[in-house]
Structures are given as C-alpha cells and as structure tokens.
C-alpha cells in the first residue's frame, strides 16, 4: 500500500485553524496593482476562511494536517 501524499499546492495555500477550518489568502494581489485603489489593496491583505462546502475537499488534499 503506498503512502498517502499531501497535495503540496494546497499545503502552501491553506493553513488549518484550531476549530477545524482553514485560513486562506485573498487573490488579486500579485500584479497589475497600479490601477487598484489603496483601500482595495489594503482589504486584500486580510486573510479569509474557506467556505464550508470546500472543507471536505481541502481536508482530503491535506491528510496529515
């Protein structure tokens, strides 16, 4: 039986929380930032939580977390 492997892309994107959820970063903050307002970029710095419906998929990709 082969070992269960962690999806490395998901491991870099999601961090588990104590209550069983996963933290995630906001998108749209890598490039083409000159046309985006300071307020918009500031709000994109904050972290978010993944949706409840995606929790099972992320948990399957991160079996050892």
From Swiss-Prot:
Biased composition (Basic residues): 25-45
Region annotated Disordered, chain positions: 1-46
Domain of life of the source: Bacteria
Pfam family, one: Ribosomal_L35p
Keyword Ribonucleoprotein included in the entry's annotation: yes
InterPro entries listed in its UniProt record: Ribosomal_bL35, Ribosomal_bL35-like, Ribosomal_bL35_CS, Ribosomal_bL35_sf
Any one of the GO CC terms: cytosolic large ribosomal subunit
A Gene Ontology BP annotation from the UniProt entry: translation
A single MF term (Gene Ontology): structural constituent of ribosome
Keyword field: Ribonucleoprotein, Ribosomal protein
Similarity-based family: Belongs to the bacterial ribosomal protein bL35 family.
HAMAP family xref list: Ribosomal_bL35
UniProt protein name: Large ribosomal subunit protein bL35
Origin species: Thioalkalivibrio sulfidiphilus (strain HL-EbGR7)
Gene name linked to the record: rpmI
